[in-house]
Structures are given as structure tokens and as C-alpha cells.
Amino acid sequence: KDSVYAFPFTSNTWFMYYDKSVFTDDDIKSFDTMLSKGKVSFPLSNSWYIQAFYAGNGCTLFGDGTDEAAGIDFGGDKAAAVTNYLVDLVANPNFINDQDGAGIAGLRDGSVNAIFSGSWDAASVKEALGDNYGVAALPTFTVDGNECQMKSFAGSKAIGVNPNCENPQIAMSLAAYLSGEEAQQAHYDERNILPSNTNIT
């Protein structure tokens, strides 16, 4: 408390990119609807992403995310229902596991119509989709007849300073500048790196 650990400079989460020529504004609200209308790629073998389904059905990591004593609750009926959903998902011919760049490669050649990633892939997706470039919040999915909201991890990337360096105050000043409002705006303008500074967002 009341300590500086690092200087945040961008968000670190993920969302959905999609081809607007394939999916309507209503389609993108439901993962299951999207799977019925086009090819959807999701990084199912990546644990940073797969938890979105479990969290969406009520499984928790440290309670609300801040209660270490609450531990991890990814068991029981809620988790089993999601696991069964994912088994069926893998068998769906319109689903493609996004590994080794399969998602963006598929957007480029038209074999994929939606992927799940973060701002780091914005330029590549925009290049692949052109005027059909769409970005949206995560959709819902249906488990045992219940509509569940996918939930991604939310965090930030930050600039840290070694407290044992020769000039820690100068290093902290540099880190503060590099993560400041002006620098974050420049990163967004030049490289599409989304800012964490609320004066910009």
C-alpha cells in the first residue's frame, strides 16, 4: 500500500475481431450463433484464454480476483458443464483452434471469419480484413440452456525500475515519463498501443 511497483502504460486484455461481411451486429453477441454462420477461431489450448468459458459459468480465481484466501474454484458441476461444452466445441466443423498463427492466417485467406486476440494484433487484422474489419466485446455462450458471458482477464503492461540500480530516482523519472499521458498518446498514434491513462481513453 502507498508504494510504487511499476508504471502502467497499456491495457493487457483481449476481445474479438471479426469479418463484418460475415457476421451482423446481432450475430456477434452470441458465440454459438457465430459458429452457425461462419468459421470461428479461438486459442483453446492457451490457458490465458480458455478460462473465459469457466469464469463465464461462475468459476472463480481468488473470489472476485483479489481474495487470495478464496483460492481457485474451477471444479464441480459448473466446471464439468463447461468442459463438456468445450468438447462439443472442438467437434464443431466451424471451430478452429487458434494456435501457431492459424487465426490471422485464416483471416488472410478467408478460411476464418473471427478470432480472439488483443490490441497487439490490430494492425495485422485490419490489413487482413480491410473494410470488413470489426472489433467487439466478448460474446455470450450457452451452457446447459443458460446464457453465459465470456470473461477475459484484465490487466496492464507496465514499466518497472530496478530499485538497486545506480540512479533509481532518475530511472523512476524516466519510467514515469515513458508511461505518461504524452508518451501513451504517442504510442497510440504511432503504433496503435491502447493507453491505460484515463485522460486519453
Across the structure, where does each feature detected by a protein language model lie?
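A structural signal for short loop-to-beta-strand junctions that line the ligand-binding cleft
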Residues: 1-18, 39-43, 145-152
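Flexible hinge/capping segments at coil-to-helix
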Residues: 23-37
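Short helix-initiation/N-cap motifs at beta->coil->alpha
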Residues: 29, 96-109, 120
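Hydrophobic residues within well-ordered alpha-helices
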Residues: 34-35, 54, 105-110
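Glycine-centered hinge/linker elements that transmit conformational signals in sensory
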Residues: 68-99
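Paired acidic/hydrophobic, glycine-rich loop segments that form the ligand-binding mouth/hinge
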Residues: 113-118, 134-136
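Extracytoplasmic/periplasmic substrate-recognition and gating elements
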Residues: 127-191
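Long, aromatic- and glycine/proline-rich binding clefts that accommodate carbohydrate-like moieties
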Residues: 188-201
